[in-house]
Amino acid sequence: MDTSRDDDFTFSKVSPPDSEVKDLASDVGSITLKDGLDQQKSNGLIWKDKSLPPKEETIGSLSFTVTDSSSSKKQSNESSETFKTPARKPITRTKVPFEKGYSQMDWLKLTRTHPDLAGLKGESNKRLIPMDEVKKHRTGDSMWTVLKGRVYNISPYMNFHPGGVDMLMKAVGRDGTLLFNKYHAWVNVDILLEKCLVGVLDDTKVKKQEP
């Protein structure tokens, strides 16, 4: 038996059809190659992201893998928006809520209708009042304070004060000008407490008492 023909292997080159060669050449010619380092920098090393599903593409007899980077960009943008620090809200100063019937409009109505808010009982509101007398009026319906050289009975205004009664009590029986200017420098006290005017501070006696 002749076995020489079984071991004789002959290889011959088989050329693809001309049409397939032309298509393959045109498809390969349209592929653009870019620098790998620049691609990694621009895409944030997206090729290392295993979560992106690869796609198999075939051009003629040439097959290769394509990775979609658009989803990775969306995820990075969404994550950056998620971790943005929220802007701080400005801190506002809270006011003490007034009781019904004690708004500033209610106070304005009262000053127009009440005959004697200062409690003068017929006395003049232009008389000179020493500081010693101011200190004696600290309770009840007669609470005096000095504002910009004038003496006022602020007892009727207590419940109308936007800052509360406790804050206004700090000025009772003393000169409250500094405290008033600290919080209400823009307020015209001559108009606000016009009907509460008791008199004018006698600053001559105050100066004599100073060392």
Swiss-Prot record:
Q: How is loss of this gene reflected in the phenotype of the organism?
A: Reduced number of emerged lateral roots and lateral root primordia leading to small leaves and short stems in flowering plants.
Q: Which residues bind heme?
A: 161, 184
For the region Disordered, give the residue spans.
1-23, 42-90
- GO cellular component annotations of the record: cytosol
Which GO BP terms sit in this record? lateral root formation
Question: Where is it mainly found?
Answer: cytoplasm
Record domain Cytochrome b5 heme-binding: where: 126-202
Q: Does the keyword RNA-binding apply?
A: no
Listed transmembrane segments: none
Instruction: Tell where it localizes.
Output: Cytoplasm, Cytosol
According to the UniProt entry, which residue ranges have a biased composition of type Low complexity? 69-80
Classification via Pfam families: Cyt-b5
Annotated coiled-coil segments of the chain: none
Q: Which UniProt keywords apply?
A: Cytoplasm, Growth regulation, Heme, Iron, Metal-binding
Q: Which GO terms describe its molecular function?
A: heme binding; metal ion binding
Spans of biased composition, class Basic and acidic residues? 1-10, 47-58
Similarity field: Belongs to the cytochrome b5 family.
- What does the function comment of this entry state? Involved in the control of lateral root (LR) formation. Acts a positive regulator of early cell divisions involved in LR initiation, independently of ARF7 and ARF19-mediated auxin signaling.
Report the PANTHER family cross-referenced here: CYTOCHROME B5 REDUCTASE 4, CYTOCHROME B5 REDUCTASE 4 FAMILY MEMBER
Name of the protein in question: Cytochrome b5 domain-containing protein RLF
Question: Origin organism of this chain?
Answer: Arabidopsis thaliana
